[in-house]
Amino acid sequence: MCSSDLEVTLGAIDALAGVTNDPGALMVSARRLLEHQPVNAPLWNVCARAVTALDPRAELRTSARLLRDDATAAHLAAALPDDATVCTIGWSGHVVDALQRRGDVRALVVDSLGDGQDTLRHLSRAGNDCELVAPEGLATAVESADVTLVHAAAVGDDDVLACGGTLALASVAWCTGRPVWMVASEATRLPAALYDPMVDAVRGRPDPWASGFDVMPHGLVGAVFTPRGGPDGAVALAVSE
């Protein structure tokens, strides 16, 4: 999907800003937004902060600024080795941004529910060296890469929610001794009260394998990139917002 969680969240902030003078309307609007975005961590984060803030409008302005000024991609771009080959999966605007900033990094993009094709299209248009990898080629792609890049949709205390195939990608990298770097962008870190229900909704359905999401333990991650910097150890997941 090309419409990222970031774009949806920024649009929701604009909508919520129009009802900040009515706490009841703000609560109802936030609840309706979350019903339609059950795994959008930035949106859940923004809504939770807005409905509990003494000044919801100011809180929304702060959230919008932090999301727009997110420097995660810049930190990742600066850390990537020269002329490296990376393996990534699905769609991440921050990963794509980092690779476009570099230009010298080759990307092997494993598809996940068609999102890998969106990544390939954006990288190709920017002139990046990239190739789409079918799921059955995942292991060999990881072995051929210098770094495996994954992106957290939501970060919990012990694990992360990520696009389908991420657990397999990171597990292969871990087993073959390849570094796993993870992007945990602005507002993806959630408290247990928000993260656990999100994961339960994914795992509690009759066919969790068809949800499009994986739950990956922190232990598979060797380095983390957040808006505040990186590469940091996985311990950064415990404190990143």
What are these regions (language model features)?
Residues 103-111:
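Active-site core of metal-dependent hydrolases
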Residues 110-241:
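Conserved phosphate- and dinucleotide-binding cores of soluble alpha/beta proteins
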Residues 64-82, 91-95:
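A short, well-structured juxtamembrane/interface segment
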Residues 92-103, 168-171:
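Histidine-anchored nucleotide/phosphate-binding helix
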Residues 4-27, 31, 81, 208-212, ...:
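N-terminal targeting/anchoring "stem" of glycan-biosynthesis enzymes
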